[in-house]
């Protein structure tokens, strides 16, 4: 079968931004969005019809309830657009605040109309009560992290599966920053670091306005921290060529160990991918727990041949089972059963149900 071209793979990775296009399937693939928005729309129609009927009668109608009706329909339209553009995680806090305001509005309108007599006011009050219930459900969902039990249970019914958790990712990065990385071949690695300059840890993307040293307190200690860019050129180190360097005496070994020179994972955006990865994808680190770096299991849908000029890509066969992590971008970091690590195109694999254990 036809394989992806190296130029196409590089072109995809050169753009660190994910394009969001209007796609109705993103909305239709989420049962929670369809169900809640459908019920909210029906409730809104009931509230609108009841309010018009009450206002047309002799009974005085609270004018603020009209703004409640307008605000609620604008909120539903916004949610529909956000789902179609797949921007829910980007505007989660805004949605939570907007829904919280809507909950206050609908609750106030309910309190103003529910005590009116007649079927017309009863219909309007029922519509506002249903809208208040839907708004409360939205506050619980959008106000919670994707890793929360309620969100994970709700997202499990979605065709796209459970959404990635920013909280879990940040916690994993924080844990990994407290654990020193131990290279597989420390003696040659230490020798290479002596001849390498140690730049300050910084974000590669200057457009974000982040510069300077992010970890100044740590850099002032005796332990040296190396940016992932220092490792460029070392990724294809031949095992056989490094074996002679392992023949050193115990004194040199003690000296190297006492220097405590290591690489700590840095939260930096790799220029070759559109995902945030530390320590050059974390491919040359042993942070103690493999599940932190490769928590998911994926199956290869097609055969992929890695670009020989790209040191980070790995090849795999159709049907091969891989351990993957950082699954938010087009390129995922992966580990094969033979221990080989690298990056793979996400459209060539599919995630299996559940996390790896």
Swiss-Prot record:
Cellular component GO terms, alphabetical = plasma membrane
- Span of domain SH3: 293-354
Compartments, record wording? Cell membrane
GO biological process terms, alphabetically, are: regulation of actin filament polymerization
Write the protein's name: High osmolarity signaling protein SHO1
* Membrane topology type: Multi-pass membrane protein
Q: Which UniProt keywords apply?
A: Cell membrane, Membrane, SH3 domain, Stress response, Transmembrane, Transmembrane helix
Subunit details = Forms homooligomers.
- Transmembrane regions listed in the UniProt entry: 32-52, 64-84, 94-114, 122-142
Similarity remark:
Belongs to the SHO1 family.
Cytoplasmic side of membrane? 1-31, 85-93, 143-357
Q: Which SMART domains match?
A: SH3 (SM00326)
Q: Which PANTHER family does the entry link to?
A: FCH AND DOUBLE SH3 DOMAINS PROTEIN, HIGH OSMOLARITY SIGNALING PROTEIN SHO1
Show the PROSITE patterns listed in the entry: SH3
- Gene3D superfamilies referenced in this protein's UniProt entry, alphabetically: SH3 Domains
Sum up the protein's function in the record's words.
Answer: Plasma membrane osmosensor that activates the high osmolarity glycerol (HOG) MAPK signaling pathway in response to high osmolarity.
User: Which residue stretches are annotated as topological domain Extracellular?
Assistant: 53-63, 115-121
